[in-house]
């Protein structure tokens, strides 16, 4: 019998994880976990000049994602001993500012020490003032779309960030 296998990838807050399962029955064949080298930068911009960050910031280095991807894919495949298919899951509230060609701004020398050029994690709440301003203006204008969000916007959403 010819088996098919699937690989699932999850990029969490502190680490990336991979799992390989047999498609026919979901049996786990191999796994891997790798912690991000720079972790979460919530006090200082430790991957750059070390400057102190404002309250409620939660940033990451996008290079950690690529390095982690390489590690966990190879380790999971080795652990399972199979050639997998691949699937990807990411958190929609994590934002990466990038150039037209996809280069994250924090990887450009002129933006390396700019906190807003780094990946803003789902738990980055540094945009609360902007979220409040957007809601206030939407209420004043009686914007119909605001009701779809329960009359509020989270600072974790793309628009305030």
Residue map of PLM features:
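Gly/Thr-rich phosphate-binding beta-strand-loop-beta motif of the actin/hexokinase/Hsp70
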Residues: 2-31, 35, 85-98
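Intrinsically disordered, low-complexity regions
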Residues: 17, 40, 151-152
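Alpha-helix termini
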Residues: 23-25, 39, 74, 137
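N-terminal glycine-rich anion-binding loops that anchor highly charged ligand groups
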Residues: 28, 36-45
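Glycine-rich phosphate-binding/catalytic subdomain of phosphoryl-transfer
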Residues: 45-48, 54-161
């Amino acid at each position: 019998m010819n088996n098919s296998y699937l690989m699932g990838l999850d990029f969490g807050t502190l680490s990336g994880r991979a799992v390989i399962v047999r498609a026919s029955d979901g049996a786990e064949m191999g796994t891997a976990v790798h912690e991000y080298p720079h972790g979460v930068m919530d006090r200082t911009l430790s991957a750059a000049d070390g400057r102190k960050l404002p309250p409620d910031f939660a940033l990451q280095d996008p290079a950690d994602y690529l390095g982690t991807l390489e590690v966990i894919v190879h380790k999971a495949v080795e652990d399972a001993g199979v050639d997998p298919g691949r699937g990807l899951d990411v958190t929609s509230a994590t934002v990466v500012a990038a150039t037209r060609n996809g280069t994250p701004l924090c990887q450009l020398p002129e933006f390396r020490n700019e906190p807003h050029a780094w990946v803003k994690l789902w738990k980055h709440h540094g945009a609360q003032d902007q979220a409040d301003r957007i809601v206030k203006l939407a209420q004043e204008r009686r914007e119909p779309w605001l009701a779809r969000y329960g009359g509020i916007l989270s600072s974790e959403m793309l628009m305030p960030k």
